[in-house]
């Protein structure tokens, strides 16, 4: 499982020109599910996303001392199978390391449900849809989590 985690001042996702998910201050999570991933990765990834200290204790501060939970931030979760694109050969990425859509959707939905259990506002895109994502990256702070 791979998650690109981005600290944002705001983020939104559109499908067919319509906003389907939108947040203010918090985290944008681009989520890729690999073909070897199981439910065992979900708890660790959920904890990391919710507990990583990526926010300053005070506005304008430079030390990251608070998590998204501690600031009562918001989460925008977007499915992103292309995180498993392999570009080592040829000119076209191979996605053979990505989980099948049915398995990926099940694990993605479980991940979103675990994040929602935190009580934070959680918005999502539409799994498998072509989406336009607008990200107001704060910092910029962008990290890759992999399990």
Curated annotation (Swiss-Prot):
InterPro entries xrefs: Daa-tRNA_deacyls_DTD (IPR003732), DTD-like_sf (IPR023509)
Pfam family, one: Tyr_Deacylase
Position of sequence motif Gly-cisPro motif, important for rejection of L-amino acids: 139-140
Cellular component, GO annotation: cytoplasm
GO annotation terms (biological process): D-amino acid catabolic process
SUPFAM superfamilies cross-referenced by the UniProt entry: DTD-like
Catalytic activity, reaction form: glycyl-tRNA(Ala) + H2O = tRNA(Ala) + glycine + H(+); a D-aminoacyl-tRNA + H2O = a tRNA + a D-alpha-amino acid + H(+)
PANTHER family per record: D-AMINOACYL-TRNA DEACYLASE 1 (PTHR10472:SF5), D-TYROSYL-TRNA TYR DEACYLASE (PTHR10472)
Role: An aminoacyl-tRNA editing enzyme that deacylates mischarged D-aminoacyl-tRNAs. Also deacylates mischarged glycyl-tRNA(Ala), protecting cells against glycine mischarging by AlaRS. Acts via tRNA-based rather than protein-based catalysis; rejects L-amino acids rather than detecting D-amino acids in the active site. By recycling D-aminoacyl-tRNA to D-amino acids and free tRNA molecules, this enzyme counteracts the toxicity associated with the formation of D-aminoacyl-tRNA entities in vivo and helps enforce protein L-homochirality.
Subunit structure: Homodimer.
Record's protein name: D-aminoacyl-tRNA deacylase
Record lineage: Bacteria, Bacillati, Cyanobacteriota, Cyanophyceae, Oscillatoriophycideae
